[in-house]
From Swiss-Prot:
This is Glycine cleavage system H protein. It comes from Aliivibrio salmonicida (strain LFI1238) (Vibrio salmonicida (strain LFI1238)). The glycine cleavage system catalyzes the degradation of glycine. The H protein shuttles the methylamine group of glycine from the P protein to the T protein. Keywords: Lipoyl. The modification N6-lipoyllysine is found at residue 62. Residues 21-103 form the Lipoyl-binding domain. Pfam families: GCV_H.
Length: 126
């Protein structure tokens, strides 16, 4: 796992891209709990998202799980590869399995996220 990632309590990860956007996906822990991912309901480009509200859905052989926006902003890109290869969420949760890129509407949202080392400690306690 990359050290620059930040997380939410609901297991989404965020990578700052350095251009006012962030890339969002679900953590390795989350994909492990879900099992084999068979479908990802992607948001639409230009959709506005609000921190804490669901913006995507990941379906696995075990369950369907809402994915919550870790920050508020506008979807600027979606990972269309997931339409044909949803298993990327399992195989490469921090690389090829990203879900969307979001243009931040409030940089302050990033301060509410959990640093990677603290996130790892929290899931070890579960």
């Amino acid at each position: 796992m990359e050290k620059d990632l930040k997380f939410t309590a609901s297991h989404e990860w965020v990578r700052e891209n350095g251009d006012g956007t962030v890339t969002v996906g679900i953590s390795n822990h989350a994909q492990g709990l879900l099992g084999d991912v068979v479908f990802v309901d992607l948001p639409d480009v230009d959709d506005e998202v609000t921190a804490g509200e669901n913006f995507s859905l990941v379906e696995s052989v075990k369950a369907a799980s809402d994915i919550y926006a870790p920050i508020s902003g506008v979807i600027v890109e979606i990972n269309e590869e997931l339409e044909d290869s949803p298993e990327l969420v399992n195989e490469e949760p921090y690389e090829g399995g990203w879900i969307a890129r979001i243009k931040l509407s409030d940089d302050g949202d990033l301060e509410n996220l959990i640093p990677g080392d603290q996130y790892l400690e929290s899931i070890e306690e579960e």
